[in-house]
Amino acid sequence: GYASDIIARLLEREGIENYMVEIGGEVTMKGVNQNGKCWRIGINKPEDDSTGIKNDIEEVVQLCKKGGVATSGNYRNYYIKDGKKYAHTIDPRTGYPSEQSILSATIVAEDCITADAYATAFMAMGLEKAREAAKNIPGIEYYVIYSDENGKHQIEYSTGMLQYLPNRPIEAMLNE
């Protein structure tokens, strides 16, 4: 996230008003794309894939203002030992790989370093604590994909995230 923000600052210093900087899935953007439309990026479906080849889209995030978007997940960087999957996200409380139900956490924030930090933190803290933290952190919105008690993928997002989800019609928003 930090590197994306630094490059964005360099572009702005050169007078560039419309850009999208993506480094390793961390994105800083401002203005519009070459077609005059708001920038759109995809959130991948959390499918186990250590190769990074699978790129099926779960959701689209659209940003029409300056900001950062980052997604952290446990479905690409992991290892399996004795039949158990270990994610690359380390829980700072234990020093061991995080064992939470969150598969993917996407954050929209004013800058990418903030989005990146909270996306990783949400992965480590788990759904309940992430939900509570988001209520107390001004300027961030979240979209989380998690595994429920039956192993089925579910989504949850903050109310403010709806403004960045162009594929969700108003009627669907009111019913969720």
Question: Model-flagged regions — what are they?
Answer:
Residues 1-176:
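Mature catalytic core of soluble alpha/beta enzymes
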